Amino acid sequence: MNVSYRKLFEILKKKDISKSQLKEVLDLSSATLAKLSKNEQVSMTTLIAICNYLNCQPGDIMELEHKIDKDTLLYRLKEEKKAKLKGSIYHQTQIKLAYNSNHIEGSRLTEDQTRYIYETNTIGLEKEPASIDDIMETINHFQCFDYMIDCANNTLDEEFIKTTHKILKTNTSDSRLPWFNVGEYKSRRNMVADRQTTPPGKVKKEMDKLLNEYLGKQNISFDDILDFHVKFERIHPFQDGNGRTGRIIMFKECLKYNIVPFIIEDNLKMFYYRGLKEWDNEKGYLRDTCLTARSE
C-alpha cells in the first residue's frame, strides 16, 4: 500500500503556503519535507503537527493507494464501468442500489422505471406521473455511484462525504432553497423518527470526531463500517439525503476493505431501521440484516 500527499499540497496551494514556510513553521527537517514531496511514509507525530497547523484531519492531507488486485469486486466494477458492459454486475448494481436506496426514502419510481432511466437516459412513464425530484435523484444517484467507485480506495474524508451529498441533491427542489446548503452541513435542526439529531452548530465538530475515531482504527471490520453508519445517521449532518449518502459511504468502505457490500431492499427496510435504533443494545439486529441483504 502506497501513501500519497497530493491532498496536502493542494491545501497548501489554496492557503498560499509554500513548502519552505511549512518547514520553517513546524521545524521540519529537509529529509521529512523530501519524504512528503516523494510520497514516502513520515511519522504520525509529523502528520498530527501538520493537521494541527492546517486545522484539518489526516484524511484531508493523505490517502493510501492500494495496489491493483484484479480479483476484487472493486476492480471488476471499475473495468465494467469503463467498458460500459450491459447486463454486468456494475450495470445491475447501479439500478438496484439507486432504486432501493431512493425507495427507502420515499421515491415512488418503480425498479423498472429506474432501469429504463439508466439504460436509455430517457423517462418512460406509462401510467402515473412521477415527481421531478424522484427522477433527478435517481439520475444523481447513478453519478454518486460512479464517483464512489472512482474514490473507493481513497481514505474516507469530509470532502468525499460532502461531494457525494452535493451530487445527490443537485438540481432538486431542495437545492433551490437558500438555507438548504447542498454539499454542506445543515443549517436547521432535523429529526430521525422520534430521535433528536446533532444541532447544526455542533455538526462539524461531531463529524470530525467521528472521522478521526474511524480512521484511527488499525483494521477496519464489517462492524466498524456499520458503527460509522449508525453514528453518521444519528448526527444526520445534512438537511436531507443523509440515508442515501450514508449507504453510499458504507458501500465504498466495503469495497475499499474487500468486504462484500450489500443493498437494503424493501423487505428488509424495517429490520434495517430497527438495527439502527437498537445498535447500542444489540448489534446483531443491524449486522444480521446487512448480512441477509448481502446474500440476497
Task: State the predicted function of each range.
Residues 1-21:
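A short, Lys/Arg-rich alpha-helix, primarily the initiator
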Residues 13, 24, 52:
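Alpha-helical residues within the helix-turn-helix
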Residues 20, 31, 59:
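Key DNA-contact positions within bacterial/archaeal DNA-binding proteins
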Residues 26, 37, 54, 62-65:
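DNA major-groove recognition helix of helix-turn-helix
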Residues 27-42:
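Recognition helix of helix-turn-helix/homeodomain-like DNA-binding domains
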Residues 45-60:
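DNA major-groove recognition helix of helix-turn-helix/homeodomain DNA-binding modules
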Residues 65-296:
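FIC/Doc superfamily catalytic core
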